[in-house]
Amino acid sequence: CTAMFGSTGTGLAATSYLSEDSDMLGAEAAYAALEADLQHELDNYESLHPGYDEYRFDLDEIKHDPYVLTSILSALHNGVFTLGEVQGDLAMLFEKQYILTQTIETETRYRTETRTDSEGNTYTVEVPYTYYICNVKLENFDLSHLPIYILTEEQMGFYAAYMQTLGNRPDLFPNGSYPHASTPKEPTYYEIPPEALKDEAFAAMIAEAEKYVGYPYVWGGSSPSTSFDC
């Protein structure tokens, strides 16, 4: 992709995070704060949204990869961003990643009531009433699925390059503090039997595929410039 070519120095810069650590860590903290607010709402949904007889929850896990977030922001801002510049981006990404919906359904139910007639005799009747059910659904679209929808092809190239190298900052988001952060991965190589390579078409296909060994997985990517999703 665009960020992967050029001189060694240019290539290194093009695959590196160039923003200040304080801005990158600040953006991550701001996004995590939005997630914490969402989690608080879900944890206290019944008290924050009272008035229903029953609450039913279908909730995806709230999580994201900080390297994906930083790579998206870097690609959106030509490699360098400040925390102040990305506040709108963080809100936009959060709104696209997390879709919280509430739907209300009603059922007619019956409760038994005891009544007394004019002669003092008691009897029971089944009285209908409306039972309100609040269905709460949270979908985590996955932050890594968003780039294909919000980045240009050129920006996708830079995003893929950042994800391939983790911005040359594998120390920025250590797993101990950021359990969902990506970690550096070495390509897995498969030893192809020599007899299989006697097939010229197969050999040509393998030769072409080997050009892209090590390219990162990018959801929706379909070319060398955007990386690939399969």
Predicted regions and their residues:
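Intrinsically disordered, low-complexity
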Residues: A3-P216
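Short coil/turn segments at secondary-structure boundaries
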Residues: G220-P224
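Active-site nucleophilic cysteine motif
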Residues: S225-C230
